[in-house]
């Protein structure tokens, strides 16, 4: 049974501001998608994973109302309570949009009703009086943007969240939200949660770049290993029992297309670069995301504590990704970055 670690002690994981806000988040965070709350991932299992992350210097945790139909929030909330952490020492982000089970007319989307009732339900499942960041899990074109921004502003003013953000929103939608916030003296979002990895780059590096530069828009990026593809485990086929053979079967099919085969070849080549610097393919891919200073935190997914230990070692390779190595990776990917000084 995992023992309680009451006080947070930062280790080697660096901290970054969430965009231009004053909130500091660990460069790696731990997410509950596909794991905690699902079958086989009960409170005890979740607690062991959260404690391992905490002991390594991670204090930021991500979930959503839709994850395991709300059970992810329930299990993670119970695990945190049993670990006895001081509320001021960790950061929780959750998301509303998809609902947490039954899809009734007002239990999904971004109406003011669902945004407020959805977070209230999330807080009840988490067993917390507030979250640090509440995010709109997807845009909702059926709801006026003013209603959306006013609802999130109300949650913050009511003390149920400190900040709000977006997830997989377009640059135009984020800009629209900022415009509404400025026009009506409301609270603007501070960060987006986009998919970002070395095979999925255009939206984050090009579409969102102006928002990062103008507003200092932050990012809590997900799928840094692209559902495991960047780990190298699929370089020689799809192992039986792996997520691509069970959960992401459509993605497995995509790997059989000419484009998919090209991507696997690119992963093989980049895996050789990882070997040259002493990293695993996963560690290189994770370190690569953190070379981008516009990334506030990279969300890790882990089904067991040992995976967290190995993935967090990626911080040791951030500085080893020199401009020459980054250029070589871009050449392998046949990707031309914008001419900006965004890497450090």
Swiss-Prot record:
Described purpose of this protein according to its UniProt entry: Probable accessory potassium channel protein which modulates the activity of the pore-forming alpha subunit.
Keywords annotated in UniProt: Cytoplasm, Ion channel, Ion transport, NADP, Nucleus, Oxidoreductase, Potassium, Potassium transport, Transport, Voltage-gated channel
A Pfam family that the UniProt record links to this protein: Aldo_ket_red
Quaternary structure annotation from Swiss-Prot or TrEMBL: Forms heteromultimeric complexes with potassium channel alpha subunits.
Chain residues that bind NADP(+): 33, 62, 67, 167, 193, 222-225, 233, 243, 301, 303, 307, 310-311
First-listed, main subcellular location of the protein, grouped into a coarse class: cytoplasm
Enzyme Commission number, as recorded: 1.1.1.-
The protein, known as: Putative voltage-gated potassium channel subunit beta
NADP keyword on record: yes
Family per similarity comment: Belongs to the shaker potassium channel beta subunit family.
EC category: oxidoreductase
Entry GO MF terms: oxidoreductase activity
GO annotation, biological process: potassium ion transmembrane transport
Active site positions, chain numbering: 67 (proton donor/acceptor)
A cellular component term, taken from the record's GO annotations: nucleus
Top-level taxon in the UniProt lineage: Eukaryota
Protein's cellular compartments: Cytoplasm; Nucleus
């Amino acid at each position: 049974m995992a023992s309680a670690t009451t006080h947070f002690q930062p280790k080697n994981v660096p901290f970054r501001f969430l965009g231009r806000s004053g909130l500091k988040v660990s460069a790696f965070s731990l997410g509950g998608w596909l794991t905690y709350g699902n079958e086989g991932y009960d409170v005890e299992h979740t607690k062991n994973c959260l404690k391992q992350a905490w002991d390594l210097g991670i204090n930021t945790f991500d979930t959503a109302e839709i994850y395991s139909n709300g059970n992810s929030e329930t299990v993670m909330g119970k695990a945190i309570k049993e670990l006895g952490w001081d509320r001021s020492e960790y950061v929780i982000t959750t998301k509303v949009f998809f609902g947490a089970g039954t899809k009734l007319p007002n239990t999904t989307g971004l109406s003011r009703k669902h945004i407020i009732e959805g977070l209230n339900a999330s807080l009840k499942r988490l067993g917390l009086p507030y979250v640090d960041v509440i995010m709109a899990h997807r845009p909702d074109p059926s709801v006026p943007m003013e209603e959306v921004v006013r609802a999130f502003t109300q949650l913050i003013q009511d003390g149920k969240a400190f900040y709000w953000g977006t997830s997989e929103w377009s640059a135009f939608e984020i800009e629209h939200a900022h415009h509404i916030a400025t026009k009506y003296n409301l609270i603007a979002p501070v960060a987006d949660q986009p998919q970002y990895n070395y095979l999925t780059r255009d939206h984050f590096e090009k579409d969102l770049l102006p928002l990062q530069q103008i507003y200092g828009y932050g990012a809590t990026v997900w799928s840094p290993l692209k559902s495991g593809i960047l780990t190298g485990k699929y370089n020689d086929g799809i192992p039986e029992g792996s997520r691509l053979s069970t959960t992401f079967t459509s993605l497995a099919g995509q790997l059989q297309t000419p484009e998919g085969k090209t991507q696997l070849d690119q992963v093989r080549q980049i895996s050789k670069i990882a070997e040259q610097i002493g990293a695993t393919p996963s560690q290189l891919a994770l370190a690569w995301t953190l070379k981008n200073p516009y990334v506030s935190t990279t969300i890790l997914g882990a089904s067991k504590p040992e995976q967290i230990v190995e993935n967090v070692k990626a911080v040791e390779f951030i500085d080893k990704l020199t401009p020459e190595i980054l250029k070589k990776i871009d050449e392998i990917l046949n990707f031309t970055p914008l001419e900006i000084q965004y890497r450090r």
